[in-house]
Amino acid sequence: MVRRLAKTGLACALHWTGANKLIGALNGSRNVPLVLGYHRVVEDYAACARQYMPAMLISRRMLERQLDWIGRHFRLVSLDELGPRLECGAPFHEPVAAITFDDGYRDVYDHALPLLKRKGIPAAAFVVTDLIGTSRLQSYDKLYLLLARAFSAWRAGPRELARLLHGLGIRLPVRGMNDVKQARHLVADPYTAMRVLFTGLPQIELDRVIEALEAEVGIDEGSFQDLHALTWEMVSEMHRAGMTIGSHTRTHALLHHESRDRVLDETANSRQALARRLGTRIQHFAYPDGRFDTAAVSVVADAGYRFAYTTCLHRDPQYPLLTIPRKLLWENSCLDALGRFSSPIMSCQAHGVFDVFARCRQDHWWPVSASVAPGGGPGG
């Protein structure tokens, strides 16, 4: 509560003095248009947050509040306008912003698309092509649900998880995580455990963990209809309605963990599938979980994309158009200490004020000499 009060007070002070815009300018926000990213759009946030990951959710009502604020302070543009302007270096004479949705959840079609059409707001959707039209879950959703069920069933969740990983011969690049006694301090809850595993393992090892958890506390993927992906018919309708459709890979594998061949397969084949289905050129790509390194960016370029989007401020100097920053928002991103929508906090989010105090935890550099094992990351 103290932290939320401090954040609210700081945001109000910066907003009313205009210092938020100055800080944003010093942080480089004037040089890069604002690109916002969302994931799931739901009707009842509180109900969904009890079962699913809250940070992936925004209610339709809150999304409308945020979009209305953005619309009053920025000119909303499509990625198809924003990208070429950045490419040719043409200046923006007014603040502009673009809206994006990641992962291709069906509720974006159900709840976001009608809102966007009613308000005439351009937007983009980055989809995971292998999941389109199926009942399979995103790997991180499935992992989270399995861990939540396992932690409820196990007497000591973190300790049992460490033992499960040890039995699979899987070691995580997290200090203490491979020690059964220390692990309980690092993964105290299912969400933290999911993040440690999802961001720390290549896809082939993550699949082994999911398989082992399924053997102990299996779930029926088909029963979680709230988490299902778009159908191809929905994707086509969104495209016809004016939404830009971009790739988010074939399977949502984190590219910095994978071999060059796997990254090329994930990016190029996803692009080809979208182009074939939609009959249009696919120019935009979003990195899964916003994670990338120099090798992944190079392959994204080879796959034929003109523009790619991250979730941090780091830019690759060789490929600035393939490392365009985005700001991810969710239900609570712009709430004050009393849980109300706050224009000052929204303004600070839009101008990158909180990014000044944040530190990117990713390692974006990958030495050219690094060895790459099939299906793994550098040296692994």
Question: Which positions does each model-derived feature cover?
Answer:
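Acidic (Asp/Glu)-rich catalytic clusters
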Residues: 71, 115-119, 230-247, 301
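Histidine-centered divalent metal-coordination motifs
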Residues: 39, 248, 252
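Extended, charge-rich helix/loop segments that form flexible
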Residues: 27-33, 37, 136-241, 372
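C-terminal active-site subregion of NodB/CE4 polysaccharide deacetylases
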Residues: 1-100, 107-109, 135-155, 208, ...
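Short, glycine/acidic-enriched loop or turn micro-motifs at the edges of active sites
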Residues: 105-106, 251, 255
